[in-house]
Amino acid sequence: MTDQSTFDPGLPDSVRVLAGPGQGEMTEQRSRFLAFAFPAPDETAAREAIAGVARRYHDARHACSAWRLGHGLLPHEHRNDDGEPSGTAGEPLLAAIRKRELTDCVVVVVRYFGGVKLGTGGL
């Protein structure tokens, strides 16, 4: 029998977190995208990861980001388009994090502009 006094339906039995940092790269119409994912147990760690990538790739046109922290029904989420058209970079990053049901992580994508405007679909 379950002790109802300690049961919290807002807390999952398990959560999905990154085992460690990861990165990837792609080129789209001469624009170069570098993606980084980091475990982030709190907002301070997430902000430090973003700042670290932005410092390292200071010559990139943009450093878009998103994070999802915490567990339960209302995790703390944040996204930043960093100068890309509103909703075209940070929100798709956050959607990818949600789709994979990850938490306590931050994703940063830097873009080196290749001279061709890509439009607003899925930057």
Where would I find each of the regions flagged by the language model?
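Conserved mixed alpha/beta catalytic, RNA-binding, or beta-rich assembly cores of soluble enzyme
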Residues: 86, 90-96, 123
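Hydrophobic alpha-helical segments and their boundary regions
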Residues: 72, 79, 103-104, 110
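C-terminal regulatory domains involved in ligand/effector binding and gene-expression control
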Residues: 1-87
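Glycine- and Gly-Pro-enriched alpha-helical subdomains that act as flexible
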Residues: 105-110, 115-123
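Signal for well-folded cores of large energy- and translation-related assemblies
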Residues: 54, 97-102
